[in-house]
């Protein structure tokens, strides 16, 4: 028997370190006919904003070599719809349900978080700080220490449960952003969000996405994401939830070895709806094969030999 429980901040323990990434798993209900979703450690539901958002115009997704671009634009029906129609359906799932929160202003973030704070069976939120600050020329909150810290500070006043902050990789030094959000009360850090990229239709001489650029995810980003997790784990004390190109148990284990406490499976859910479940099984098999009794023994156990 191996132990797979991990703590992801403020005393919140999940049954295993495998989570699904926001925007790739809907509300979990969409996948319940494919797998036993209660087998997962946690499900991070799609991005939720204070008000209804239509999202960006089509086309807003594009396949790329070893990955995909997306520019969905946080399409959702708003937090009040979530409370009235989605929460009653998902609140009794036996896996942890985490709400991804996005906003255009600090007040938006704080108010959405305050509303979710009242939901008994939602014990954690994940802040998407890659959103543009509409009051500061559209620059994403998460690309400066000051911007990232301001979101966490505003939300921390309104939210008293586990607060996970999702970091943008589109920065010079992600460890500085990580330290900034930790100092303002983040209980955990999830990383990394998508990389800014673009795709072009050479025949038409036009960008493929309606927004020109979009977020790049998939196996192509894994080596960079892994490096960022490894660097960040050395400078923060809070748990790290690693993501970026995870498609197998071996991928997930690499992130744990680099210092992540848990992982999120993202766009590979589109390839195989049961991927996250297989990864849970694969981690357990790895622990048994290596005679490891507790998954926590893997966290940050990477051996680096210097010649």
UniProtKB/Swiss-Prot annotation:
Enzyme class, UniProt record, top EC level: oxidoreductase
Positions that bind FMN: 22, 46-47, 100, 128, 166, 192, 218, 244-245
UniProt name for this protein: Dihydroorotate dehydrogenase B (NAD(+)), catalytic subunit
Cofactor(s) annotated in UniProt: FMN
A GO cellular-component term linked to this record: cytoplasm
Oligomer status and interactors: Heterotetramer of 2 PyrK and 2 PyrD type B subunits.
Domain of life according to the entry: Bacteria
This protein's record includes keyword RNA-binding: no
